[in-house]
C-alpha cells in the first residue's frame, strides 16, 4: 500500500490585518491602543506533503502478523519567526511569517506473534517500533542574543538540525583554580565571562526521541495470566538540572567530588566552592557550568510500565455464586526505569515508587 497527500494548516496567532487592543489610560485619561500583531498580508497556509509506502504481512498460519511503513513528510511555508524591520515602526524585533521548511523521515514497525499455542499454555508477544529523523531545511531568522538561543530554541531554529534542538557551550574543563571553562565558536576559552555570539551556542542534540517503541507480552497457563508492557526510547538528550553547584540551589552528593586543590582539575569536572564574599567569586561561573555540554546527557531509557497477574475463576465456581464470570488481578504500574545515568533516571521520575493495583471483576 502507498499514499500521497498534501495537508494544510492556518495560522491561529497571525492575521493579514493589524490587530490591536484598547484600554483606558489611567495616567492621562482617554483611550489608548496597543498593537498586538503586525499586519501579515502575505500570510499563507502551512503545507505538509506526505508520501508513504507500507506492507502488511502474515506468516506461519497467522502466528506472526505485522506491518512496516516508511514515510517522508516535507513541510513548506511553515510559520516561523523572521527578523523584523526596525523602520516599519511596529516595534517588533521578530514576527511570525511563512518562513520555514522542515522534513521528517522515518518508519513504523508493528509485530505480533504467538510463540506458544496449546491447550494449557499460550504466549503472545507483540511490539511496535518507530523511528523519525527531523531536520529544519530552511528558515530566515537568527536569535538576536545568545540567551534567546538557549531559552527559546524552538523560536529560533537553525537550518540543518532538528527543530527541538538543545544548545550549549562546549566544555573546556576546570582551570587551575577550579573554575569552569568553555570554548567559544573560535576555540577561545572563557572563564571570567560568558561567550556572547549566538554562534557560541552549539547544537548538542535533540530533546525529542529519535526512536521509541513498546514490547507487550501475555503468558497464560490454564486460568492464570501474566502480562507486562515495556516502553523504550532513545537517540535524544536531556539537559541535566541536578547539578552539583552551590550557586544553582541544588544539593547533590557529587559536590563531594568538587575541586579542592591544584591538580584536581585532571580528575573532576565539579568546580570548587567559592562563596560570594570571596575575591575569587565569579558571577559568570554558574551560567558557564549549567549550560556546558557535559550537562547534556544521553536520555535513552527503558521503563517497565505495567506488570500484572490475573486469575480467571473457573466457571464451576462462578455458577455456585450465580456469577457468569469473574477474575482477580494484582498489578503494578511504573515498576522500574533503566537509564544511562542516575541523573536522567531522576529527571524521568524513575525513583518514584510503583503504584500497586488490586482489581476484582464480577460479571452477573
Would you name each region that the model predicts?
Residues 233-328, 332:
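Extracytoplasmic gating/loop element in the C-terminal half of outer-membrane beta-barrel translocons
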Residues 35-36, 198, 209-210:
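Flexible glycine/proline-enriched surface loops and loop-helix/loop-strand junctions
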Residues 43, 169, 256-259:
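Tryptophan-centric aromatic hotspots in well-structured domains and transmembrane helices
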